Each structure stands twice: as structure tokens, then as C-alpha cells.
Design a protein with these regions (language model features):
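Flavin (primarily FAD) cofactor-binding/catalytic cores of flavoenzymes
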Residues: 1-19, 23-258
Length: 258
């Protein structure tokens, strides 16, 4: 954004309704005081993130083992139930801040923040004059064309498939089997260990793509690597606790620290 030329239309469009989208909206609104910011999303409004302590136990280190040992259907059920701890949600305080900003602008009669709810982008055309974005409101079918200086896509991501990375080593199964220690299952003639940092949500739970369990996971992988070394005498097993114990009262596994 800092390398952009001078704004021609004084308008931004942000697509998405998660934490990243809301933070981008807040940033653009604050750093470009003359510009409009239009947030386009298909829901009616932002959904608050569930940061309640009971729900956030799904990020606890010991929960990883429980989920891994559970039936696949149960893991999927819990994943769907607790998506609101991480996916397509916004911190409640930020929701309140943006709502208050929009409300003040409505009262003052000088609007710069627009929430285009139940809407979708149907066309984007870029030329030398900027970007023309067509937005369709699903409630009444109305289509507006917004001429803007930049479009920010905060629509999330899909994890990259492992197949292209593994090449000929890729198994025929759609989801490669992953052990509890994050080691990818390989044929007997493959002696090297392949460990996954991320990409294990379907087997190890929601915490796989977050920082909540990163230190513990690194310790578990290190222990597994050392245990599999063919040294004589055997390498001493590393206890995860020896890597640095976190006080019991620490909230590293909760959403506040994510």
C-alpha cells in the first residue's frame, strides 16, 4: 500500500468477514482518512470469535491425543462445532469498535465505512484508472459498481495438498496417514522420516494450523526424530518437559495468546 500512487478514487474494497478482513478494514479506515472502505461479505454481519475457556480447551496439548485417537467422524463433528474458535470470526472488541465507527458516521452524515452484507463480488476489472468492482446484494438483487484504488482479498485459504510436494512418494489415499508424532507413513524402503508441521487438522485437530501448540509439537517431533536414530548407544529420549516447562497458570493454549 505504501508503494501505491496517489489515490484516484479514494476508495478501498475488502472482501471477507474474518479477523484478517476486519483488521484490514480498521487499518485502511484509520490510515486513509479521506477514503471510503467497503467491506463485502456474504453473511449478514461479523460473527464473534468464541474465546470462552471451555471451548478453547480444544487447543490444549493433551486434546491433540484425544482427537487423534477418536473416530474420524467424531473429529469432524467437533471441528464443525468449534470452527467459531478460529475460522470466519472476529474478535468481539474489534466488532464493537467498527460498529461504533459506522454508527458515528451515520449520525454525522459523513460516511466512509460501509458494510455490504449478504453480498458478493461478481466482477473485477482493472485498467489504468483503477479497479471497477461489481457487488451484488443477494437480498434485493441490486448490483453496484465501485470504482476503487485497491481490492483486498481476505477470504481465507485452503491448505495446499501434499501430493505435489511428495511427487512419486505420494500415497494413493486422498489423506496420507500421519502418525501421532506427526510422521508421515511411508513404505518400508523409505528410511528417512518425513514430519508435517501443519496440514494435520483432520488428524490432530484445530490447533494444527495455530501457534497454540507449536512448542509442544516441536518437542514431540524432536523426541520422535531422536528415538529413531540408529546410534549405538541409543540416543537418550528427550522429555518434552525438559525443553522448558510452562507454568500451569499460563494461558498459552487459549485464544488470548493466539
Amino acid at each position: 500500500l505504501e508503494e501505491m500512487p496517489a489515490l484516484t478514487h479514494q476508495r478501498f474494497v475488502v472482501v471477507g468477514a474474518g479477523q484478517s478482513a476486519a483488521e484490514v478494514v480498521q487499518y485502511l479506515h484509520g490510515h486513509y482518512p479521506q477514503a471510503e472502505v467497503h467491506n463485502v461479505f456474504n453473511r449478514f454481519g461479523y460473527s464473534p470469535a468464541d474465546d470462552s475457556p471451555y471451548a478453547n480447551r480444544i487447543f490444549d496439548p493433551e486434546t491433540v491425543g484425544e482427537l487423534y485417537d477418536a473416530p474420524a467422524g467424531e473429529r469432524e463433528r467437533l471441528f464443525d462445532l468449534h470452527r467459531s474458535t478460529n475460522y470466519s470470526v472476529v474478535d468481539p472488541a474489534l466488532i464493537e469498535t467498527l460498529y461504533a465507527t459506522e454508527y458515528r458516521e451515520r449520525v454525522a452524515g459523513r460516511r466512509r465505512l460501509f458494510m455490504r452484507r449478504a453480498s458478493a463480488v461478481t466482477s473485477v476489472v482493472e485498467d489504468t484508472a483503477g479497479i471497477a468492482v461489481q457487488v451484488r446484494n443477494a437480498l434485493d438483487g441490486r448490483i453496484d459498481t465501485l470504482k476503487c484504488d485497491a481490492v483486498v482479498l481476505a477470504t481465507g485459504f485452503a491448505p495446499a495438498p501434499l501430493g505435489p510436494l511428495l511427487g512419486d512418494l505420494a500415497p494413493s489415499a486422498p489423506v496420507p496417514p500421519v502418525a501421532r508424532d506427526y510422521r508421515l507413513a511411508t513404505p518400508d524402503d523409505v528410511t528417512a522420516g518425513i514430519y508435517l508441521q501443519g496440514g494435520t487438522e483432520k488428524t490432530h485437530g484445530l490447533t494444527s494450523s495455530l501457534l497454540s501448540n507449536a512448542a509442544v509439537r516441536a518437542g514431540e517431533i524432536l523426541t520422535s526424530v531422536l528415538e529413531r536414530q540408529l546410534f549405538d548407544p541409543p540416543v537418550r529420549q528427550v522429555d518434552v518437559g525438559e525443553l522448558g516447562r510452562v507454568p500451569d497458570q499460563h494461558t498459552y493454549a487459549t485464544s488470548e495468546a493466539r
